[in-house]
Amino acid sequence: MTEYKLVIVGGGGVGKSALTIQLIQNHFIDEYDPTIEDSYRKQVSIDDETCLLDILDTAGQEEYSAMRDQYMRTGQGFLCVYSITSRSSYDEIASFREQILRVKDKDRVPLILVGNKADLDHERQVSVNEGQELAKGFNCPFMESSAKSRINVEEAFYSLVREIRKELKGDQSSGKAQKKKKQCLIL
């Protein structure tokens, strides 16, 4: 059975834990209890393939930023989450992505952009169009979700697994070409 290491990142209070617990335990946690780091595992079937999701729910607070490099190194795919009710959480997403790319030392990594708390449309500070434009700039899928209403919860995680699969297939088919490119000649 294939195992996928997913990391969920974003600012504090955007609903990372709520999304993860809704996926794993099928219930919504209403109270906000800042996460330092939690790990969850769930066996699922995605596109007729049984696989194991190893999900790392991370701290959004800045005081835990030193821990980020470590979990970014081990993650295969990243759910970048902001709250549609928080302009600042949206503005932070680019720096999370930049840190992921720097740590992974790649130009592109499997990533999904998620605008959470879609059930709070009356408190919206970030438009759907802004989310779509940011995702287009990142060259990644985008969706809005609601952990509370269970909207696009599974879809977000499953789409990320599909992105990882695409990346793995791309690495296999172009692996030989990439190895040939990395040559050094000293005269």
Curated annotation (Swiss-Prot):
GO terms for MF: filamin binding; G protein activity; GDP binding; GTP binding; GTPase activity; mitogen-activated protein kinase binding; protein kinase B binding; protein kinase inhibitor activity
Location in or out of the cell: Cell membrane
Binding annotation for GTP: 10-17, 57-61, 116-119
GO cellular component, one term: macropinocytic cup
Extent of motif Effector region: 32-40
One family name in Pfam for this protein: Ras
Keyword terms, alphabetized: Cell membrane, GTP-binding, Hydrolase, Lipoprotein, Membrane, Methylation, Nucleotide-binding, Prenylation
Database matches in InterPro entries: P-loop_NTPase (IPR027417), Small_GTP-bd (IPR005225), Small_GTPase (IPR001806), Small_GTPase_Ras-type (IPR020849)
EC number: 3.6.5.2
Domain of life, per lineage: Eukaryota
Cystine bridges: none
Chain positions with Cysteine methyl ester modification: 184
Record flagged with keyword Ribonucleoprotein: no
Catalytically driven reaction(s): GTP + H2O = GDP + phosphate + H(+)
UniProt key word Nucleotide-binding: yes
Role summary: Ras proteins bind GDP/GTP and possess intrinsic GTPase activity.
NCBIfam families: small_GTP (TIGR00231)
Protein family membership: Belongs to the small GTPase superfamily. Ras family.
Name of the protein: Ras-like protein rasD
